[in-house]
Amino acid sequence: MCLYRRCFGQEKPAAPIDNRNRIIEKMGFFSLFSRNKTVEQADAEKADLERGLDKTKESVLKKITRAVAGKSSIDEEVLDNLEEVLVTSDVGVETTLEIIERIQERVKRDKYLGTAELNKVLREEICALLVESPQEDPWQQEGKTPYVIMVVGVNGVGKTTTIGKLAYKFKQSGAKVVLGAADTFRAAAVEQLQEWGRRTEVPVVAQAMGSDPASVAFDTLKSAVAKEADVVIIDTAGRLHNKIGLMNELTKIKNVMKKVVPEAPHEILLVLDASTGQNAIEQARQFTAATEVNALALTKLDGTAKGGVAIGISHQFNIPIKYIGVGEKISDLQLFNKISFVESLFGE
């Protein structure tokens, strides 16, 4: 038995496995941004996703091939080897143990499962673990106009770039968008967001360097309401050196926004850099402790072999991944679809 299962135990009952085949076959995409998508656009996005995950896929499939070499059945040795593959692919120990337990249950139930079916079983079990993202158009829900997204994350993860690309996607889908530059501690952050505003022709509300971030958020929502905007996206400072300070700052921003839009923010989007692997999980831990994160965006998947971290983060924190960055182009921020992701990552 592998070290991880010896240390953490394997007596915990496996999660229910009912409807797994139905889950893997369900191809529910977000309707947002995809309602008017052509077949050519969908194919192009799929190709971009596969290219973006090339490094992770190549690494993982090589390891799986070695794990089952010379084996025809899924035995304890194969599971030990697979466990090592997943942990070293940045899936994380906790999530890896869950996946292995699920596969053990499948082997017990389907007595004739062999290594030839391992990849398919692995895809199904990982897909069943990933948290499903909402399917509705959030900004078109009754009583949620403007729909307010507060974006959080440390400096350097691609937070402001993600906001710019997200604004572009919302605008392409027909929404009227307003951006708020509430990261007032870095002049570069405000300037970068203003540049994205110019590129996407979306208005940006900003104040002087060092201004109160909550004041910027307040002005942004007032402006959005006056403009009858559909979506507001608020950038925030990315500092983790003081969790209490971070918590207080984000709480203040939320409370001030509620004075203008009582339900705001409707979404708190945490941006994480997939290339940092397990560091991304630690950032998720700190931000989820500081505020009520309810959506994730993973950037830089195209430049790393650590794409497996997406599986661990979504499962460990029970938060859906909504967006993934798979390239430099403005259109390379994609809606996350767990089936497409898993098929691109583990497909043969």
Question: Where do the language-model regions lie?
Answer:
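P-loop/Walker A NTP-binding module and the surrounding RecA-like catalytic core of P-loop NTPases
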Residues: E94, C127, E132-E348
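Non-catalytic terminal/linker segments enriched in charged/polar, low-complexity residues
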Residues: M1-P138, E142-V151, Q172, K176-V178, ...
